[in-house]
Amino acid sequence: MPTVRLATHHELPQVGANLAAAFADDPVWNHLSPGTARWDKRAPGWFTADATARHVGIGEVLVDDQLRGAALWAAPGHWRPTLRETARVALPSLRLFGVGTVTAMRTLSAVEKRHPRDPEHWYLAILGTHPAHQGHGVGSALITAITDRCDEQGLASYLESSKEANVPFYERHGFVVQETFRLGDGPPMWTMWRDPKA
């Protein structure tokens, strides 16, 4: 299994590029973003800004030893973005979503409203592996780095999946679907919860 560690600050642009590539075919992100050319140009900057603003120093930005994938984990009690964190991704959001920025922000806010408040838990905000490296255990390593810790500390973990094909992958790691929902005319999403293993 790949070795997992915290990303360094200078690696965050590569984290952003890998996550943008990983989510390029994601139904929800495709629904929110206005076209492939804009995605390829703007999404790496958005993911880099999100990782920097919301997870460095607050949660954990985990990468594998060869920088093939990344997981953005929010620590217990820090899953909701602060006003400052939101402001730090405002310009990258405008660049990525363009005229659809307000709709995208409403959609992300509606997803946030489904987030459980209790009990205390780690939140897997984003997990992605560059498509050229998927299927080699990178995603599993990035998940178990935190879920193993959750098991040791008696903490739960939570995520939202925006792709149905990924639901069985998360289930293999102990996550259980809580709800399937649609946001307006968008594609379905799944909320998933994992209780700690004894």
Predicted regions and their residues:
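A short beta-loop-alpha structural element at the N-terminal edge
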Residues: T3-A17, A21
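Conserved acetyl-CoA-binding loop-helix of GNAT-fold acetyltransferases
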Residues: G135-D148, R172
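Conserved active-site alpha-helix within GNAT-family acetyltransferase domains
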Residues: S140, E152-G154, K163-T180, G184
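Conserved beta-hairpin
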Residues: H55-A71, H130
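Conserved beta-strand-loop-alpha-helix junction that forms the acyl-donor binding cleft
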Residues: A125-Q134, Y158-V167, D185-P187, R194-P196
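A short helix-loop-beta-strand connector motif used in the catalytic cores of GNAT acetyltransferases and
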Residues: R42-L62, P119-Y123
